[in-house]
Amino acid sequence: MAFPVDMLENCSHEELENSAEDYMSDLRCGDPENPECFSLLNITIPISLSNVGFVPLYGGDQTQKILALFAPEDSLTAVALYLADQWWAIDDIVKTSVPSREGLKQVSTLGERVVLYVLNRIIYRKQEMERNEIPFLCHSSTDYAKILWKKGEAIGFYSVKPTGSICASFLTQSYQLPVLDTMFLRKKYRGKDFGLHMLEDFVDSFTEDALGLRYPLSSLMYTACKQYFEKYPGDHELLWEVEGVGHWYQRIPVTRALQREALKILALSQNEPKRPMSGEYGPASVPEYEARTEDNQSSEMQLTIDSLKDAFASTSEGHDKTSVSTHTRSGNLKRPKIGKRFQDSEFSSSQGEDEKTSQTSLTASINKLESTARPSESSEEFLEEEPEQRGIEFEDESSDRDARPALETQPQQEKQDGEKESELEPMNGEIMDDSLKTSLITEEEDSTSEVLDEELKLQPFNSSEDSTNLVPLVVESSKPPEVDAPDKTPRIPDSEMLMDEGTSDEKGHMEEKLSLLPRKKAHLGSSDNVATMSNEERSDGGFPNSVIAEFSEEPVSENLSPNTTSSLEDQGEEGVSEPQETSTALPQSSLIEVELEDVPFSQNAGQKNQSEEQSEASSEQLDQFTQSAEKAVDSSSEEIEVEVPVVDRRNLRRKAKGHKGPAKKKAKLT
């Protein structure tokens, strides 16, 4: 029986294609209800226009085509070809009836080209190609190829790119040496040295000193090369693994590639278990093929990883050695090095840690004093004690920083004093006389303050003990206004009737305050007394540390009850023609208080009673504080810190809140 390869020895491509066209014309004119059928392994496939089509015989070349029959379940796999005016199954196309076709035979006839197409495009790609293998392209009509025939059947092939032939990947470049491009052997014939036979035939067919094998090596090529070097150890420099067209930088010896693959296979065998055998093919060929396939897959993956690592290492090394040009950069735009910048940041953070903490607490206390308006004397002075205590805790560490805010607040206070003096208006003869008297008193106070300033300037600020001794001056100087505040509160609403008495009383208060100066200086001797007074009677006016330092440098008379003034301004809002803004961050001088006393206030009897009760409660509580302070002087500073009368302060706060009058409208002092 003749097979297509035997029948098409003298047939041309045009004759084959014309025969297929005639068949398609008959199929179009045929009866669709009674189609022709093709029998294949007990399966009958109906032949219709829906499952018949032309396919290119040489891949990308569309000029030569053959007619193929596709299975209904797979429209991409041909099950038969129309050759020599009839349909032939795939298994019959690769057979021959000529006994002379044995071994490797070079492809020359159209029938042999059809056999090569079936082996490559249908049997290998659709039936026997492994997942890790790369499919071969369809051979062209001029490719050098040989088919291996065994007992009347084609079992494999190999193809070669001769020297000087055009590379499909590089259209303008030609191969520098003969390259074994493809090699295929059917699975049931593997393990019988057919691969070695094809490699030996390739070496014998070309006489060049260097022969190439296409990268990457398939499992069949790997096995064949290993057997070849075992049989011919003197040909180690003959075979090269080639990429591209085979320039000197695109090739490595195959022996080195085999060593690399052997190491990878050994590593994979130690780390990964072997895959189970399928048993689908022959028992002798399947185990060897499976092992070789696994080795080839791992070797290809590892080759890719190694190439990527080498490229990355070379790139990173080049970057490390390359120096960045700084010619176009100016000196002020250069950034410090990372290590230097890190050290500087650590040094600056450790150096400014204490300053940041103290400045944060002082700023918070000052902002709180500036943002809150004090409605009454007795309630607000205790609400401000907590930020004031935090400010005094940092007094020992930051006496120099406290002096700067004090110096800044002095010109602000002088500015306010000047503004308020410009707003004075003559009410009557008596009021002008009182203002003259108060101006004389303020001159005396200014002289006293100058003496105190000279004494304070002589004291260095670098001693924490000296800066702490300034606290008793503020603490004791704030006590007489608190004691005298109840006397002034009920007299202020009746200022038109009792103005002379208020002025004389104020002079008496100033004399008492001046007489207290020797006693204050006497308390500066011991640091324990200073700690005691600073813990118990610290800043009844509720000012932060910066304001306390200012009090120590200003005259004692300027500490006269600013809270009383603000509360009186709230109560007497109806009698004031212009809006007045209350200054809670800075103390008011006695001259400002006289101005407010000159303004007529209106107050009902209920408010008088409430103010009297507040003054009584505050006087009682201050007496208790005075007694506790005298007891504390005899004891140590540690015991005094435990005996801080926190409960009494809370009671006083509750009393002050309970005696608040009705809601009052607040006026800003200009």
From Swiss-Prot:
Q: Which UniProt keywords apply?
A: Membrane, Nucleus, Phosphoprotein
According to the UniProt entry, which residue ranges have a biased composition of type Polar residues?
358-375, 460-470, 558-569, 579-591
Q: Which GO terms describe its cellular component?
A: nuclear inner membrane
Extent of Basic and acidic residues compositional bias: 414-423, 479-494, 504-514
Task: Identify its membrane topology class.
Answer: Peripheral membrane protein
UniProt feature, compositional bias: Acidic residues: 378-387, 442-453
Q: Where is the composition biased (Basic residues)?
A: 651-670
InterPro entries linked: FAM169
Q: Which residues carry this modification: Phosphoserine?
A: S350, S379, S449, S515, S615, S618, S635
Positions of the region Disordered?
273-301, 314-670
Per UniProt, subcellular location reads as:
Nucleus envelope; Nucleus inner membrane
Similarity field: Belongs to the FAM169 family.
What's the protein here called?
Soluble lamin-associated protein of 75 kDa
Instruction: Report the source organism.
Output: Homo sapiens (Human)
**Lineage, please?**
Eukaryota, Metazoa, Chordata, Craniata, Vertebrata
Gene behind the chain: FAM169A
